[in-house]
Design a protein with these regions (language model features):
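Short S/T/G/P-rich N-terminal loop/turn motif that feeds into the first structured element of a domain
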Residues: 1-86
């Protein structure tokens, strides 16, 4: 099960941290979801996941539900960078 780390910018870090949407949209696809905030760049964050099925993970990112969750969370989609454990 690879670990995925995604970095991106958000509109409001406190809102993003408190949001239940991450867990809802990745339920059954990702486990051990952990959040991180950049210490000096106030809107840069990261999230780490353990993902069993990369195809399902990528499908969520491209889905309407994924887009709605990102919008709700204030994610700036154009800033997303995904890293896969090597």
């Amino acid at each position: 099960m690879p670990k995925i780390v995604a970095t991106h910018e958000v509109e409001d870090v406190a809102h993003w941290l408190a949001s239940p949407k991450r867990a809802e949209v990745f339920d059954g696809i990702a486990t051990d979801i952990r959040t991180f905030v950049h210490p000096t760049e106030k809107n840069r964050v990261a999230v780490a996941f353990d993902v069993a099925d990369m195809d399902k993970f990528e499908a969520v990112l491209k889905s309407e539900a994924g887009a709605a969750a990102m919008k709700y969370d204030g994610v700036r989609p154009e800033t997303i960078v995904v890293y896969i454990e090597g």
